[in-house]
Regions:
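Sec-dependent bacterial lipoprotein signal peptides
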Residues: 1-36
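Bacterial Sec-dependent N-terminal signal peptides
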Residues: 17, 22, 32-54, 395
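N-terminal extension/subdomain marker
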Residues: 39-140, 408
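Terminal, contiguous helix-loop blocks that mediate binding/assembly
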Residues: 48, 169-418
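Structural recognition of the beta-strand scaffold that forms the well-ordered cores
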Residues: 54-59, 86-91, 143-146, 211-215, ...
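Gly/Ser/Thr-rich loops at beta-strand to alpha-helix junctions
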Residues: 62-65, 148-154, 218-222
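Short, solvent-exposed loop/turn and secondary-structure capping segments
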Residues: 68-69, 99-101, 154-159, 225-226, ...
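Surface-exposed loop and adjacent secondary-structure segments within mature catalytic domains
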Residues: 92-111, 146-188
Length: 418
């Protein structure tokens, strides 16, 4: 999906004596033109021809992410001016009731619906909003972006001992902040959880609900969560690490001004969207903000990846329980539960050879991947060991924890050991 821009710069004019009278006469006319027309390097955007494609950006921001909302919507407005499809936004923020609106190619808002206070972290709310967006803005194709906090596949009540003593703290207090699917501090009359758990999300969404789902949240590049979502979209996009949330530094989730134009095409466009995402962060002037990971996953290949992983790990749960995780590529920082390790690195460490089938399937599954060498100066990422996906190691010391039970009782991926 391409877009056009027209750029005006300075014109170097050569005057000759015979043309002086003309230019003097024209000068008075030129001075009447708006000053903006004489600015250097002014960009006039020529919008692409519209296509029948809607992307819903679902912003569960009734939490500390409220501070990032204005920046994100501004970015979406900029991106819409270069986009062929239609961006629809649902936003639930602190101190306001939720609303649904579309963004025009001129960057304006068109109100679609207003809501009473509700729990945007309830997956049934998400499913309803998707249905309403499709009804109010009908189109041939549909994409979905989930925007909020996240702890990956972990359930809301994960045990505190997953974060070692001495490293615990509120990540929001530090710099840069990150987006720890969807927390809602004011759920209205909804008595359901204020956290959207991945198995409940998968149950609530119909199969083939979108062509792609982009998780603009932390830690959702985990194989456990993506496998649960394998039937919901053709492609899944996520980060195995945290995602920055520093709007003041132009470093907050997806840079929609650059990425949105690519979210209305096919897989090649999605790959270009990921390239733009990575390039945005990799070019940051501050090293601490040069922090991003991204993976584009072909959901149709996830079943094959389950089989290939099971072929090498079946019956090896005991080996996993005793695994020395200190040698693995990790994707968690100090304040994040220490359970996010590189999937490929785990398999290669445990199996020690005989991984050709697994490696080939992993390459088919992860269409595109990229990672900066460092993440917020706390985490080194080896390009050699970066597979694009994280995976849980069910260590014996986690037995008895609620997330250990949740993993084996609720997540289908745990079947790789059976």
């Amino acid at each position: 999906m391409s877009y056009q821009t027209v750029t005006f710069g300075k014109l170097n004019r050569k005057r000759n004596m015979n043309k002086r009278k003309f230019f003097r006469a024209a000068l008075g006319y030129c001075l009447l033109l708006p000053l903006a027309s004489c600015s250097e390097d002014e960009e006039i955007i020529v919008p692409p021809d519209p296509v029948s494609y809607t992307t819903l950006v679902y912003m569960a921001a009734d939490n500390s992410m409220d501070s990032e909302v204005d920046y994100t919507i501004s970015q979406l407005r900029q991106g819409a001016r270069r986009s062929a499809g239609t961006a629809v936004v649902y936003v639930d923020r602190e101190g306001e009731t939720p609303r649904l609106f579309s963004i025009t190619q001129q960057g304006g808002e068109v109100p679609l619906k207003s809501y009473a206070e509700e729990n945007s972290a309830n997956p049934e709310t998400l499913a309803r909003v998707i249905s309403e967006a499709k009804e109010l803005v009908p189109s041939d194709r549909f994409g979905l972006v989930l925007w909020s906090h996240s702890m990956g596949w972990l359930p809301g009540g994960y045990d505190s001992d997953l974060v070692p003593q001495g490293t615990r703290g509120n990540a929001v207090d530090g710099f840069p902040r990150t987006r720890y699917i969807g927390i809602d501090n004011h759920p209205g009359n909804d008595s359901s959880s204020g956290v959207m758990e991945i198995d409940a999300l998968a149950d609530a969404l119909p199969d083939d609900v979108a062509e792609y789902i982009w998780f603009d949240v932390c830690l959702m590049g985990c194989i456990e969560g993506l496998y649960e979502m394998r039937n919901k979209a053709d492609y899944l996009i996520a980060s195995p690490t945290e995602v920055l949330a520093e709007a003041d530094y132009d470093a907050s989730g997806i840079p929609y001004a650059k990425v949105l134009p690519y979210l209305f095409g096919g897989v090649e466009d999605l790959e270009q969207a990921c390239v733009a995402y990575y390039g945005h962060y990799n070019s940051m002037g501050h090293d601490i903000l040069r922090s991003a990971t991204i993976a584009l996953v072909d959901a149709a290949e996830l079943g094959g990846l389950f089989t290939a992983t099971r072929n090498v790990l079946q019956g090896r749960l005991h080996d996993m329980e005793a695994l020395d995780t200190s040698v693995l590529q990790a994707y968690h920082t100090d304040n994040v539960p220490n359970v996010f390790f590189d999937m490929g690195d785990i398999v290669h460490t445990v199996v020690e050879g005989r991984t050709d089938e697994f490696d080939a399937q992993l390459r088919r599954t992860v269409v595109y991947k990229a990672a900066t060498p460092q993440f917020i100066n706390k985490l080194s990422i080896s390009q050699e060991h970066f597979s694009g996906l994280s995976m849980y190691v069910p260590l014996s010391r986690w037995k008895g924890n609620c997330e250990y039970s949740y993993y084996f009782n609720n997540l289908e991926w745990s079947g790789i050991y059976e």
